[in-house]
Amino acid sequence: MALFRNGNGIAWARRRALVWALFALAFCAAMNIYHYSLQGARGLYLWDKTWLFRILILMGLLPLGLLALSLPLEKIKTKAPSKLLRGFSLVSSFLVSLASLGILAFLIAAPRMGELRKADLNLIDPSIKLESSSRLYDDQEMLLRLSVGSDAHWGTEKTDSNARSNILATIAENKPDLFFLLGDTVETGSSVSQWNAALSDLSAIVPKVPLRPLMGNHDALFGGQYLFKKAFFPEAFSSDSGSPYYYSIETKVATLVALNLPWGTENFDRKQRTWLEEVLKTADPLKPIIVFSHSYFYASGYDDPDLDKPWYDHYQNIPALTPIFERYGVDLVVSGHNHYMEFLEHNEVRYAIVGAMGSKSDPVPAHVSPASKWIAVATFGHVNINITKDYIVVEFKDQLGKTLHEERIRYLPSLESGSNERSPQA
């Protein structure tokens, strides 16, 4: 072991450089392990400026690499090149250690700095059966009334705050049984001030509306899950999945399922998949099934030059989840993430995109999904979902409550005689 040979200054210099390089590697590993344990971090790596996150992963190897390069140079007569590389190794060890500890401290401390305001909200505990209030709709009794919005993005100047407030006021006037907020509530999840701005507006405009938010990719940024749970999932709450990020909500007339898909399938692990299939399999065959998520499935869109990714017909979500929806007869899937409003249909499953709650619209679609039936671009709004005994009525509303488009989905139960389970479709 020449690296640890005692009795000369070179061996001691090697040992010192190696120890510091190992410290740097350990600090870098600890930072990355913590970062990628956070919600949405793996999706951030795959979808947004991947070169930066690859540098953060690989920078811990730089000091060791420089030290390894110095070893062959010790055989030449002049020792200056090897000393120089060892010096660079020591300097890089210090810088990598400092950067790793700084990033780790930021990820831990940022979402915990400042005080989250107490909000006057009617938050719904997913573990409690949802009661509904009936109302007549075109001479039919509405058994359950839902409102859905997504991508409000409090905290950025790219959002139209007036449109957002108008949408909330329209929802408050509608008095739904439940308002689903499908994520990207804030621009940067670790920012307490942005969450406080969101909570302030929600408390002022929809304090009495039963509310159930999902977590989007922006909500999760840099440890934002801590503030999301503190704001929207108190310690007294629970869910059938054991997670605050995905669950089903029991109602008398429908099965409501919330998924944890901030970016794509990065969080769709075996546990969530098994839970989802069990929920769908055992759902009451006489009730419609409506699934909610942040990221979309079928959707029109464009090729994002900044991310170098297709922002349409989601290449992860479609193969991983749509066969499950089709197998168990899901009636409607509602998502955000894409800043349009759109209605689509594929293999008898309907999809609604509602990411238009005030945030800057995505560009005019360069790719129109073959599943698309209707789309509104550069139009702010939300969706109302009214369930009657025969239909799911999907109403796309603009920011002032005007109906832009309506779809009636007749839900047909998939029954097996004597069974209370949905039979998977062939």
Please report, for each region that a protein language model flagged, where it lies by residue.
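Acidic-and-aromatic substrate-binding clefts and catalytic sites of carbohydrate-active enzymes
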Residues: 155-161, 187-193, 264-268
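Active-site glycine-centered loops adjacent to acidic/histidine catalytic or metal-binding residues
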Residues: 151, 183-184, 216-217, 294, ...
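Extended active-site neighborhood of metal-dependent phosphoesterases/phosphodiesterases
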Residues: 110-138, 192-289, 304-332, 340-388
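Residue-level marker for buried hydrophobic side chains located in beta-strands
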Residues: 146-148, 179-181, 213, 291, ...
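Feature marks short, surface-exposed loop/turn motifs that line or immediately flank catalytic pockets
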Residues: 178, 219, 297-299, 360
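Acidic, histidine-bearing metal-coordination/catalytic regions of metal-dependent phosphoesterases
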Residues: 1-159, 165-177, 203, 208, ...
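Short active-site segment of divalent metal-dependent hydrolases/proteases
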Residues: 154, 186-187, 219, 255, ...
